[in-house]
Regions:
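A detector of tandem-repeat and repeat-rich interaction/domain scaffolds
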Residues: 1-14
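Compositionally biased, low-complexity repeat tracts
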Residues: 6-9, 52, 71, 126
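Polar low-complexity intrinsically disordered regions enriched in Ser/Thr and small residues
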Residues: 8, 43, 59, 113-114, ...
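Long, positively charged binding patches that form subdomain-scale interaction surfaces
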Residues: 15-73
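ADP-ribosyltransferase catalytic core
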Residues: 61-124
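Long, highly charged low-complexity segments enriched in Glu/Asp and Lys/Arg with interspersed Ser/Thr
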Residues: 117-139
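Arg/Lys-rich low-complexity patches in intrinsically disordered regions that function as generic
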Residues: 139-145
Length: 148
């Protein structure tokens, strides 16, 4: 049977390790990087609190939702790069963040997951990602040389 898109929340006998590639994050030693889609002002696009993801900032959410059946919940919701690029709209930014496996609160299906703590490393270049066109530089007009 093709169960693509099926909601199996609460189904018995389902082993998420067979279906959720992001569970590999739990086995990673040391620092792990992921992505955060933010508004133009670096604020979180969701309404769980005024979190701002500026470079160098360490964010914490001690009371993050640990229920993996909740796609989006209280906490610092991060994503894969394909997810962030797919959900990106004009005026938004994509940030690279760093965390550890111990910081992970929940890993639902779908390309997103929640952490309790992360540090913002850098802002990704939207031109390099192919999400926006490069800004055209104005052409320099050369002044003709005046004969002496």
């Amino acid at each position: 049977a093709n169960l693509t898109g099926a909601n199996l929340t609460g189904a018995d006998g389902i082993d998420p390790r067979r279906h959720n590639d992001l569970l590999m994050l739990l086995d990673q030693p040391g620092a792990i990087c992921a992505y955060k889609l933010v508004r133009g002002d670096y604020g979180s696009p969701m309404g769980y609190g005024p979190l701002y993801y500026t470079v160098g900032t360490t964010l914490t959410e001690a009371d993050a939702d640990t229920d993996a059946t909740h796609d989006c919940g209280r906490g610092i919701n991060l994503a894969t790069l394909p997810w962030a690029m797919r959900e990106w709209t004009e005026g938004h930014r994509i940030m690279l963040v760093e965390f550890t496996a111990a910081d992970i609160a929940a890993i639902p299906l779908g390309g997103t997951f929640r952490v309790r703590k992360c540090t913002v490393i850098k802002e990704l270049d939207l031109v390099e990602l192919g999400l926006v066109e490069p800004v055209a530089k104005p052409k320099r007009v050369r002044k003709p040389k005046v004969a002496a």
